[in-house]
Amino acid sequence: MKVIFLQDVKGKGKKGEVKEVPTGYAQNFLLKKNLAKEATTQAIGELKGKQKSEEKAQAEILAQAQELKTQLESETTRVQFIEKVGPDGRTFGSITAKKIAEELQKQYGIKIDKRHIDLDHTIRAIGKVEVPVKLHKQVSSQIKLDIKEA
């Protein structure tokens, strides 16, 4: 019996796959537990339509990430931080991913989730720094920071 998997089933198939499985297994397990549905021509047509719309949405998200990358990498986009500095040249407060995301939003209107900013450790020194940011699975960029003394 041909079925369309509605969820991942270990050892059998992934969500959205159309596969031939034993009839008893399909009727007694997959269909009853709503893990799959019978692969009729109508159901396969619906699946293809859903896959096309998902691909279109993914392409749109990728295009937005590419646009955001060009915005971030332009010469004019440099996030300014003015921090108090101690006698040893280190800032009193540290600059975190959350702070970078907030300043980017405030200064340029670019909204990025703080979890996408790949900051190994907090920044505590003054100067110019480039911080990597992951915008999409296929798109990554750099945020330029300019940390100055107050």
Curated annotation (Swiss-Prot):
Keywords: Ribonucleoprotein, Ribosomal protein, RNA-binding, rRNA-binding. It holds the Pfam family Ribosomal_L9_C. Gene3D superfamilies: Ribosomal protein L9, C-terminal domain (3.10.430.100), Ribosomal protein L9, N-terminal domain (3.40.5.10). It comes from the Bacteria. GO terms for molecular function: rRNA binding; structural constituent of ribosome. GO terms for biological process: translation. GO terms for cellular component: ribonucleoprotein complex; ribosome. InterPro entries: Ribosomal_bL9 (IPR000244), Ribosomal_bL9/RNase_H1_N (IPR009027), Ribosomal_bL9_bac/chp (IPR020594), Ribosomal_bL9_C (IPR020069), Ribosomal_bL9_C_sf (IPR036791), Ribosomal_bL9_N (IPR020070), Ribosomal_bL9_N_sf (IPR036935). Belongs to the bacterial ribosomal protein bL9 family. Binds to the 23S rRNA. This is Large ribosomal subunit protein bL9. The gene is rplI.
